[in-house]
Amino acid sequence: MATREALAHVRLRDGVAVIELVGDLNAAAEPALDEAWTAATSERPDAVVLSFENSGYINSTGIALVVGLLASARAHRIPIRAYGLSDHYREIFEITRLADFMAIEDDEDQAIHGAIHGAIHGDAQGAGGDGNG
């Protein structure tokens, strides 16, 4: 299987930093993800949303990188949400309990709305993990 180079683009929407993940999430993705996280959180956003719409394969190291982002978000009390996961990866995030620590939404609008709603109400994770926050 050919791998796609990982890129991560950061943009701000309504006070929420959106990290768009492009390509495969594996060990090679760590520098791009670290750089994106630093850029996204440098100005203390209300929340961070991870977009998986254009991501590809996610291996166990990629899952570990997401866990690292969750740990950093929790340590800095930054709510975090995700959207755009395929059904397969959404199930993996639920089985591994990543979904307990970040809401997984269907689209960007839901993720942004939930992040803002969660941030307004002081929810450190931005949701209770059920995706309906």
Stretch-by-stretch model annotation:
Residues 1-12, 116-133:
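Non-catalytic signal-transmission and effector/linker regions of two-component phosphorelay proteins
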Residues 2-35, 52-54:
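STAS-typified acidic loop motif
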Residues 8, 16, 55, 61, ...:
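Exposed boundary/loop context
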Residues 25-102:
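Amphipathic alpha-helical interaction surfaces in cytosolic regulatory modules
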Residues 102-107, 111:
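Short acidic-hydrophobic, aromatic-tinged amphipathic segments that line or gate anion-handling sites
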